[in-house]
From Swiss-Prot:
Gene3D superfamilies in alphabetical order: Nucleic acid-binding proteins (2.40.50.140), Recombination protein O, C-terminal domain (1.20.1440.120)
PANTHER family: DNA REPAIR PROTEIN RECO
Originating organism: Mycolicibacterium gilvum (strain PYR-GCK)
Stated name of the protein: DNA repair protein RecO
Domain of life per record: Bacteria
Recorded GO CC terms: bacterial nucleoid
Keywords: DNA damage, DNA recombination, DNA repair
Stated family: Belongs to the RecO family.
Gene: recO
Length: 273
C-alpha cells in the first residue's frame, strides 16, 4: 500500500521493545491512528522529540497490517513546550487529549471537526491569553457537540420548550422545564447556565466576566455531563486544579442515584476557578 501524509495531534505514546514506541494520533483526514515509531527512543533518532504528546505534526505513514509505521515527521506548531512547562496548562491539555481519544472512537473514522477543535484548544492553552479552565470547559462542551452530546442550555432537553429553564439533569440531556424535570434535577444559578452557553458559543466577552463560583459550578456540570455520556470516568480530569468541581459532580451523581424528589441546590463553590 502507498504511503500517506496527514496532519495530526499526538495523543499519547508507550514503549515498544527496546527502541520503539507506539503513538496514538488524532489525524485530520484519517481519524484515530495508532502507529509504530521505530528507533525513536535512541538518542540519534531523527524525530523522537516531535512525537511527544501535544505535538502538532505533519506525519507520513506506511500502512501496516495491525499498526502503521511512521516514516517522516515535521513539526507544525511549537506549543507543546509551553504546555509541558506549566503544570496547570499541562493538566488541562491532558484532559483535552484524553477526551479527544474517547470521542474519536473507532480507528480510521475521520472526525476533522474534532481535530480542528483540539488543535485550536491546545494553542489557546499554550498562549495563556484566556483562563485555561474556561478554555478546557469550552473544549469539552464543543467536543460533546461534535459527538452529538451537547447539553441543552436554553430550550428544554425533552420537549424543546423555549427557555431559559433553571433545572438541569445530566441523564435528561441538560436544561429541563418544570413539566419535564425528572427527580434528581439540580437547580444551578442562571449565571451558571449562561456561562456554559457562552463557552459553547465562543462568547468570551461574557465568559470571562463570570464569577469564580459560577465557573466552578459550570465545570462540575460539564464534567458530569461528559462522563455520563462516555460511561466512564476520565483519569485526567481530577488532576485539573479547580476547587469545588469534584464536590459538585459527586452531588449530581448522588442525586441521580437516589432519585431525590425535591429540587437540589448546587453546593456553594469554593473561591477560585
Amino acid at each position: 500500500m502507498r504511503l500517506y501524509r496527514d496532519r495530526a495531534v499526538v495523543l499519547r505514546q508507550h514503549k515498544l521493545g527496546e527502541a520503539d514506541r507506539i503513538v496514538s494520533l488524532l489525524t485530520r483526514e484519517h481519524g484515530l491512528v495508532r502507529a509504530v515509531a521505530k528507533g525513536v527512543r535512541r538518542t540519534r533518532s531523527k524525530f523522537g522529540a516531535r512525537l511527544e504528546p501535544f505535538a502538532h505534526i505533519d506525519v507520513q505513514l506506511h500502512p501496516g497490517r495491525n499498526l502503521d509505521i511512521v516514516t517522516q515527521v515535521q513539526a507544525i506548531d511549537a506549543f507543546a513546550s509551553d504546555i509541558v512547562s506549566d503544570y496547570g496548562r499541562y493538566t488541562c491539555a491532558c484532559a483535552m487529549l484524553e477526551t479527544a481519544e474517547r470521542i474519536a472512537g473507532e480507528e480510521r473514522a475521520p472526525v476533522p471537526a474534532l481535530h480542528r477543535l483540539t488543535v485550536a484548544a491546545l494553542r489557546a492553552v499554550a498562549d495563556g491569553t484566556r483562563p485555561r479552565e474556561l478554555v478546557l470547559d469550552a473544549y469539552l462542551l464543543r467536543a460533546m457537540g461534535v459527538a452529538g452530546w451537547a447539553p441543552a442550555l436554553i430550550e428544554c432537553a425533552r420537549c424543546a420548550a423555549p427557555g431559559p429553564h433553571r433545572a438541569f439533569h445530566v441523564a435528561a440531556g441538560g436544561s429541563v422545564c418544570v413539566h419535564c424535570r425528572p427527580s434528581g434535577s439540580v437547580t444551578p444559578p442562571q449565571g451558571v447556565l449562561d456561562l456554559m452557553a457562552a463557552l459553547y458559543d465562543g462568547d468570551w466577552e461574557h465568559a470571562q466576566i463570570s464569577t469564580p463560583a459560577h465557573r466552578s459550578q459550570a465545570s462540575g456540570l460539564v464534567a458530569a455531563h461528559l462522563q455520563w455520556h462516555l460511561e466512564r470516568q476520565l483519569r485526567t480530569l481530577p488532576l485539573v486544579e479547580r476547587p469545588g468541581r469534584a464536590e459538585v459532580a459527586r452531588n449530581i451523581r448522588q442525586d441521580m442515584a437516589h432519585g431525590n424528589q425535591a429540587e437540589e441546590q448546587l453546593p456553594p463553590a469554593a473561591s477560585g476557578a
